[in-house]
Amino acid sequence: MAKVNTADVGFEKQIWSAADVLRGSMDAAEYKHVVLGLIFLKYISDRFEAKYQELVNEGYGMEEDKDEYTAENIFYVPLKARWSVIAENAHKPEIGLVIDEAMRSIEMENEKLKGILPKNFARPELDKQKLGDVVDLFTNIQMKEQGDSKDILGRTYEYCLSMFASAEGKNAGEFYTPSCIVRTLVEVLKPYHGRVYDPACGSGGMFVQSAKFIERHQGKINDISVYGQEYNPTTWKMAQMNLAIRGIDANLGDFNADTFFKDVHPTLKADFVMANPPFNMKEWGADKLQDDVRWKFGIPPSGNANFAWLQHMIHHLSPNGKIGMVLANGSLSSQSGGEGTIRENILKADLVECIVAMPSQLFYSTQIPVCLWFLNRAKKQPGKVLFIDARNMGTMVTRKLRELTEEDIMKIAGTYDSYLEGSLKDEKGFCAVVGMDEVEKQDYILTPGRYVGIAETEDEGEPFQEKMERLTGELSELFAKSHELEDEIRKQLASIGFTIK
């Protein structure tokens, strides 16, 4: 049996490493459902077992009463699906069948989970010995005094999502938005209470970060109502599991659906809309939606859905609602297909509050440069737009991937807060508050670099001639050292019979 594990910050990596061995020849896109399914099964079983034991201790014989669990938003787990049974069968050849049957029985007992859980653990290509080892890992999670399985397994689910995004590369955009981008949206919008909506919700990251924000500020998760929609059926299922693990009661519709053609929340007016819709989406069905009520500011072009997504979100905005969304940089300046006119009309309606140009290489899935749009139906600074140029922010965490630091995120959010308070001073090269007359002069193009200018470089006070003499002297010394090293290398190679011509 696997050794007892302490559920500290490194536990997510331990689970990932062990589970990665389990993968074998399966590709990441298929395999993620196996790993995430196991995490989910362990989570709901832990919550059920805790409540079950509580009811046993009360001594009224109510431990098998389903209503006792559903009243507290706990999924009812039938006997054959409880983790203790899974653990007992961990190293039997039929462990895959046992887990599949557990998933089926949980779906039968819980209407909300019907058709959502993965049932593919019995497949021949899944190594059953390694599957048992991963079950052991979960079985032996040892909580610390302040431990909480919901938090630990939630963190693990989130970590594995990010690792799958890394493994899948260009396909990852369907289900995963980098957490630093989501955090930036959330820290700016501050969704403490009200209706939160994401029309392209992927695996539910916007909602998870909103819940974390509320927890950090001692709020109550029940102060927000969560609404989402997702087109991809497997991603929709992942979102349902992700939110359930976090204890977030969400309405993602009864099924996956196309946001443009089957709006599952047609009457919703949200207080906060947050989204990272597909960039520059082509073939989105514009020809069938020419007279749609959502296109208040102009009909979006058939070859690019950027302004269809933006107008869909505006349509669902409450009278005091705010939007925070990720779009490709082309949305800031494009004039093709009537996009310039749509952008102009949205600006004239005084809905745009802030535009942030983001650094490159933030996504696993694309190198397309992106920006953040923030809109507000009740702007505190009417007739003005805040521009932030954050392109120089972030640190490279791998050769190909950049992340915003906590300090970066808080600087962007703090700049926005100061703007709302009316105390923000322009910072050349980083931020500027601009009146609509200036935006009009720029033909309603919203690229932040046009407005914030170039940061002033600090004058070091060293005359140019002296500086060049100093630098060339240093370079000369470096050249001399390189020649010495070259001679030494030649000498050492010659001593063992090799020469460089």
Protein language model annotation of sequence segments:
Residues 269-270, 294, 304-306, 320-322, ...:
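Active-site lining segments that contact anionic ligands and/or coordinate catalytic metals
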Residues 262-265, 280-283, 333-336, 364-367, ...:
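Switch/connector loops and helix/strand junctions flanking conserved nucleotide-binding motifs
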Residues 1-192, 251-264, 357-360, 382-398, ...:
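Non-catalytic, mostly N-terminal accessory regions of nucleic-acid modification and defense proteins
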Residues 25, 284-304, 330-339, 359-364, ...:
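Short, contiguous acidic/charged loop-to-helix segments that flank catalytic cores in large enzymes
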Residues 14, 21, 30-31, 35-43, ...:
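Conserved Class I SAM-dependent methyltransferase catalytic core
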Residues 351-352, 362-365, 369-414:
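C-terminal, active-site-flanking charged/polar segments
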Residues 124, 146, 200, 228-232, ...:
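Hydrophobic alpha-helical scaffolding
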Residues 171-275, 280-296, 307-308, 327-330, ...:
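Conserved S-adenosyl-L-methionine
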